[in-house]
Amino acid sequence: MASVAELKEKHAAATASVNSLRERLRQRRETLLDTDVARYSKSQGRVPVSFNPTDLVCCRTLQGHSGKVYSLDWTPEKNWIVSASQDGRLIVWNALTSQKTHAIKLHCPWVMACAFAPNGQSVACGGLDSACSIFNLNSQADRDGNMPVSRILTGHKGYVSSCQYVPDQETRLITSSGDQTCVLWDVTTGQRISIFGGEFPSGHTADVQSVSINSSNTNMFVSGSCDTTVRLWDIRIASRAVRTYHGHEDDVNSVKFFPDGHRFGTGSDDGTCRLFDMRTGHQLQVYSREPDRNSNELPTVTSIAFSISGRLLFAGYSNGDCYVWDTLLAEVVLNLGNLQNSHDGRISCLGMSSDGSALCTGSWDKNLKIWAFSGHRKIV
């Protein structure tokens, strides 16, 4: 029987071999790709989206949290936003009036993720307690904000990093976790339907940070991980990932499907956003910025979102910048961080309203801001 030292040696050799093959595959793909989206678009005479500093303005500042804002989500149909903060509360906001309709005090204050149910009647949240809690917003809360939990989803062995309801299904929810897995839940029973990763060899090998469900085909979702990869999953086949996407050189913090459902975007600690083709596995474009002028360091990408057409990519950064990228030409058309009433801290989360008319950003400065296209500006 092989000793521990021999097994470690074999494991190291196998890992080196895999990394070598992966690098050869990456180089081979680069030779086959004679262009990228930006070069092709420029060759066809496409011009950047014209943006002025007054075209996207901060129309609301949502103040009420007493700690860093970590996560936010919009309702699919109505103008409501839920936010999760280091202060241990979920707040539900009316995006039109800035009024708080709920301020839910959580049993575990270390919350990292939140999501609205498709019908807007429930919210989910998860964090360092390794559980996902469901609250029915029709339940009565006491004067301190304590509200009964309608369901607690337990089973993860690490923190819950993100959660998202399956579109148009109030009873299905997907979570990602520091235990290297994603889980599909039946919210009604509180039971796990499927586990993605874990003991399966095609799963992630480090913390899973983010998930995004394909609204065009809700059987498919992608997950981004600290193992620098993104994996595509089919909820009908949990035993293996459909495809693994390489390209990033550090943790993948955010993943988001493109509006057409055929591509998806990513944001990473390596300071770049990337666009991938879901079907071919090819990386279509890299959106890379210059280092921060003050620190000379490359800010990390914390969160991303697409405009309703997909022409714009919004990317939040650790230094407080929020870039608006032209996805076709890979050029920055606006930095919300330079505008009046911008955040004074790390952008931790952002999300686009379902009709594409407004962007909400959350920050470590304890505030959320709603950015809307000005009256004369056509929604892109």
Swiss-Prot record:
Membrane as UniProt keyword: no
Gene Ontology biological process: defense response to fungus; endoplasmic reticulum unfolded protein response; fruit development; G protein-coupled receptor signaling pathway; jasmonic acid mediated signaling pathway; lateral root development; plant organ morphogenesis; reactive oxygen species metabolic process
GO terms for cellular component: Cul4-RING E3 ubiquitin ligase complex; cytoplasm; endoplasmic reticulum; heterotrimeric G-protein complex
Molecular functions per Gene Ontology: signaling receptor complex adaptor activity
Highest taxon of the lineage: Eukaryota
InterPro entries, alphabetized: G-protein_beta_WD-40_rep (IPR020472), Gprotein_B (IPR001632), Guanine_nucleotide-bd_bsu (IPR016346), WD40/YVTN_repeat-like_dom_sf (IPR015943), WD40_repeat_CS (IPR019775), WD40_repeat_dom_sf (IPR036322), WD40_rpt (IPR001680)
SMART domains: WD40
Tissue: Present in the root, leaf and tassel.
Keyword set, alphabetical order: Repeat, Transducer, WD repeat
Cell inner membrane keyword on record: no
The WD repeat ranges on this chain: 64-94, 106-136, 155-186, 203-234, 247-277, 296-326, 342-372
Family the entry assigns: Belongs to the WD repeat G protein beta family.
Functional description taken from the UniProt entry: Guanine nucleotide-binding proteins (G proteins) are involved as a modulator or transducer in various transmembrane signaling systems. The beta and gamma chains are required for the GTPase activity, for replacement of GDP by GTP, and for G protein-effector interaction.
Quaternary data: G proteins are composed of 3 units, alpha, beta and gamma.
Name listed for the protein in its UniProt record: Guanine nucleotide-binding protein subunit beta
Organism: Zea mays
Source lineage: Eukaryota, Viridiplantae, Streptophyta, Embryophyta, Tracheophyta
